[in-house]
């Protein structure tokens, strides 16, 4: 009996060696399709029969399009598992996959630190009016015309976090380094250990008390 087949959907940027190492236990295959129509036809032709697992990157959407009900129905009957390499899985219809008996995984904690870094950068930029100054600089006006306002220090400001998941908790730690106090609202109140001492408030109180409001949750 040969090795099970693992399908790569999309280019790998940082873990090619790890993917290649899977060849010890699986036959690694890559579709020849260049777009969704070709990929569906490739699936229907039987060329991908025997694939039991697929690893998809965000870039795979240019080949497969969304992993929706139409695509799921065309996937090989042998496919039992899809590994998605991001936290958000809005490109994958998990209900359609479940109906086909296909399990789907994601990596919810991987981007927490990097996302919170960018979040903090945007908060500082909003407080200090970075965008106005950058536009003036690119226009060749060192001080701006008229000069932009000085903006606000983060120290002493109240950061309201809506959605205290991994990103929200990570952001809380970074904001406190800049002297901000943190309040939050979540679907449920977190334990003292999970919240790191941040104050849990109602949604209305969050809007009332926050100097800066950070949304860290699915917008739908």
Q: Which residues does each PLM region occupy?
A:
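Phosphate-coordination loops involved in phosphoryl transfer and adenosine-cofactor binding
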Residues: 3, 79, 155-158
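Short loop/helix-cap segments at secondary-structure boundaries that form the rim of catalytic
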Residues: 17-23, 92-99, 188-197
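Phosphate/diphosphate ligand-binding glycine-rich loop within oxidoreductases
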Residues: 50-138
